[in-house]
């Protein structure tokens, strides 16, 4: 309450008092209820996926070793660097910013993938390992023992665009574009007798821009259902 006396005049000075009163303020109790309710996770499904991913990682690791002609720690950038640029003789590209040694980051491996299958397989290995460690193995540990749900934290001021962000865990960043990512999403399940309903704005920032600036070409493009990103 003491902060309110300081912050309210600042909101009025900046013309933001109506925004807080009509939009941001009423949103807070909604987010609080969402956080408290949480979301159900099918832990058994994730456990099965973890086992399958572990086997897939092991297969990919063995395939990398066979193609490289040597067994090494695929997770070690140093050892991978030695295999790619010394043993296989591939040309190094960019260097790391800190130590100034040949990089083995994703961009470098993507460049090398056309030259040797090892680089492509390492990319696949890393993606699978990230999904397994970040989501499949981590989510069950975040399930509340009493509610059986995962309870994230939402941040209404976390992004400059006004979009929500979330953390612990970041439920707004669950992958969806790959088959493995979609399988992870399938582990989030609705309450008994309920279904999930998903809706999303299409190009919401540009639509708001068209409304505010009144640009006739931009407005006409939206009304015609055109791809605004291609037009601009």
PLM feature segments, named:
Residues 185-187:
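A generic local secondary-structure boundary/capping motif
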Residues 224-232:
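Generic long, charged, amphipathic alpha-helical segments
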Residues 1-179, 189, 193-195, 202-205, ...:
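Conserved "right-hand" nucleotidyltransferase catalytic core of DNA-directed polymerases
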Residues 74-75, 199, 221-224:
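Conserved, non-catalytic sequence blocks in retroelement Pol enzymes and Pol-derived host proteins
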Residues 211, 215-218:
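Signal-transmission/dimerization alpha-helices at domain junctions
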Residues 182, 206-207, 230-231:
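Feature representing long, continuous alpha-helical segments
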Residues 199, 209-210:
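Long, highly charged, low-complexity internal segments
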């Amino acid at each position: 309450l003491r902060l309110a006396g300081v912050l309210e005049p600042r909101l009025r000075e900046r013309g933001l008092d109506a925004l807080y009163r009509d939009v941001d303020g009423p949103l807070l109790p909604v987010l609080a209820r969402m956080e408290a309710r949480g979301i159900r996770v099918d832990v058994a499904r994730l456990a099965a996926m973890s086992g399958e991913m572990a086997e897939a990682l092991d297969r990919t690791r063995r395939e990398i070793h066979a193609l490289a002609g040597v067994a090494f720690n695929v997770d070690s950038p140093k050892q991978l660097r030695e295999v790619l640029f010394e043993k296989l003789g591939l040309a190094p590209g960019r260097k790391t910013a800190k130590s100034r040694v040949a990089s083995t980051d994703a961009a470098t491996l993507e460049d090398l993938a056309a030259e040797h299958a090892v680089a492509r397989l390492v990319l696949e290995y890393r993606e699978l390992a990230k999904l397994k460690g970040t989501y499949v193995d981590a989510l069950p540990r975040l399930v509340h023992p009493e509610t059986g749900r995962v309870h994230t934290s939402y941040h209404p001021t976390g992004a400059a665009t006004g979009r929500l962000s979330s953390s612990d865990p970041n439920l707004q960043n669950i992958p969806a574009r790959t088959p493995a990512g979609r399988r992870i999403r399938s582990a989030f399940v609705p309450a008994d007798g309920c279904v999930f309903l998903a809706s999303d704005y299409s190009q919401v920032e540009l639509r708001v821009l068209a409304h505010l600036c009144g640009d006739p070409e931009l407005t006409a493009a939206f009304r015609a259902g055109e791809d605004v990103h291609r037009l601009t």
